[in-house]
Amino acid sequence: MADVPSMDALVALLRRLPGIGPRSAQRISYELLVRKRDLMPQLAAAFQQAHAVVRFCERCNNLSEAPLCAVCRSEHRDRSILCVVESPADLRAIEDTGVFVGEFFVLMGHLSPLDGIGPEALHIDRLSARLGETDLQEVIFATNPTLEGEATAQFLAGLVPDGVTISRIARGVPVGGELEYVDRSTLGRALHGRRLLDE
């Protein structure tokens, strides 16, 4: 709207978020400006607070408000099993199954040469340090079952030391799907039915 530049700016910012197209951005903007005006200061404060305090866990790269996230601080995790995921949302999806008791490493993405995302963007140095820990017995690659997710798992498998079991979550997760949208039961079965990566 040419006569409301601040709304145009809001729409443009919302469109930069994944999954929000031009029409959705416009609807959200109208809703906030017309029906939910009292929500806008609260949203602004929540954004500022999150921006100020949320950081990346020093051990696994998950989102946290402390140097270590709750998973890494827990004394009840099996430190011999490391599950590598693409995003904090994927970590949460696996945690919500109640099946996995090991530790995590969050890549914050996947390899995608066409998008200019190479190994350096995936915190490989930090992952390599985790893979070098002496108590590690198994690495589970729980990257999304997409071409990029498969390529990422295959590439990272080459970094795993000899003697450490390498597995991939089972195909109960639909090909082309994303972990954060898979139901708990399917994701739990996929974790239980994981396979060795070289099979």
Swiss-Prot record:
PROSITE patterns: RECR (PS01300), TOPRIM (PS50880)
Gene Ontology biological-process entries: DNA recombination; DNA repair
Keywords assigned by UniProt, alphabetized: DNA damage, DNA recombination, DNA repair, Metal-binding, Zinc, Zinc-finger
GO MF terms held by the record: DNA binding; zinc ion binding
Statement: the UniProt record of this protein carries the keyword Translocase: no
Top-level taxon of the source organism: Bacteria
Key word DNA repair present: yes
Domain Toprim residues, every copy: 80-174
Record family assignment: Belongs to the RecR family.
Protein name (record): Recombination protein RecR
Higher taxonomy: Bacteria, Pseudomonadati, Pseudomonadota, Acidithiobacillia, Acidithiobacillales
